[in-house]
Amino acid sequence: MRTIRIGSGAGYSGDRIEPAVELAEKGNINYLVFECLAERTIAIAQNAKLNDPTKGYDPLLVERFEAVLPICKKNGIKIITNMGAANPQAGAAKVREIAARLGLGKLKIAAISGDDVVEALKVSDTKILETGAPASSMASVLVSANAYVGAAPMVEALANGADVIITGRVADPSMFLAPQIHEFGWSQDDWDKIGKGTAVGHLLECGGQVTGGYYAEPGKKDVADLARLGFPIAEVSEDGAIVITKVEGSGGKVTEHTCKEQILYEVHDPKTYLTPDVTADFSQITFTEVAPNRIQVGGVTGRARTDTLKVSVGYNDGYMGEGQISYAGPGALARGQLALEIVKERLKITGVKANELRFDLIGVNSIHADVLAPAPEPTEVRVRVTGRCDSMKEAVRIGNEVETLYTNGPASGGGATKSAKQVVAMLSALFPRDKVVPVIEYLEA
């Protein structure tokens, strides 16, 4: 029975590049998938495209493709990625340019768009899930609205001979599912097989998480050679049999436990994992070690997909200003607490208008606030003050006040930093599937 091998080349936009090179060189893979598009990333990319119509794709696209494209071309590996972000056409054009510059010969590149529904949402009565308000009520602040497209357009592109597929917003598991459907000729309403293929995608989509990265905890869950963490590979057979593994000799490990942690990642209901392709059921999933770093996956089923697609909605939510400064040595905690009180009072005196303010001592209460039992007094703390404002001018003033602690006390502050930036916040909606029409464009290198 025929088997294919799919490698995960990235788990987020800024991920390491050398594990993908290792997969292409030593992984004996047929497909290399780069998942680089977090929820907020595409809204940021949309802003970049508005400022420059030739931008809006992933900032590391060029560096990644320069590293892996020659190897993939040589070894006959197809590449699928959502690094197109807000501008798949520009991303595909850049890949064509790289291929030509490197003299790689003939290459067919597919750019998949159609996920951008922001203009439709601006005049839509579609409800925002978190607020219940109609999307049209946010028209003036909307930055982006992208539907999670499924595997179908990628399957079509592969059938038409694409060597590289550059997409915008697609569901993460769908990029791994598409080659399985294409290679094995699975019907896209064979729900159990589509469910199995989706489980493959969910296990691989975060890259090194399933090979022990996110799993590692010294003394409890030790993982060797994390500095050389290998990224995962799925071996998938035509009948849906699955083995998760990694490049032999690479760092990290693939075990029942790493797979169990990853299958639960971002899953609210294991019995009803909704994707554009299927309603997958992970509730009876099994993981069995068949050899070191080789985990067999079973028990996954699927049901019919929904009539709606999730839309990730990005909107302008003001401006965030931040300032930080450190105190060390005896009395560091007391000086840090005094610094916070001074800044709090200064913001009142100077009339800074902030919708939200937060005052933290990093290393003391910035994560758990005051819910944990008191720890021994630290000998170093870092003050952090941040606030969300309606204007950049007001946001800048927050960091400025923290910086003035340098000379205005308390004693011995150092390492002050400040920043101010626009806030792009995220909401979600459900949009009719039949109103989202993917578009495929082909470029020849």
Segments predicted by a language model, with ranges:
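Flexible, glycine/charged-enriched surface loops at secondary-structure junctions
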Residues: 105-109, 210-222, 270-289, 345-362, ...
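N-terminal glycine-rich anion-binding loops that anchor highly charged ligand groups
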Residues: 27-45
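Gly-rich Lys/Arg/Thr-decorated short loops/hinges at beta-loop-alpha junctions or inter-strand turns
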Residues: 1-3, 39-55, 73, 117-141
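N-terminal amphipathic/basic leader segments beginning at the initiator methionine
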Residues: 1-24
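Catalytic or ion-translocation cores adjacent to nucleophile or general acid/base/metal-coordination motifs
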Residues: 100-117, 177-218
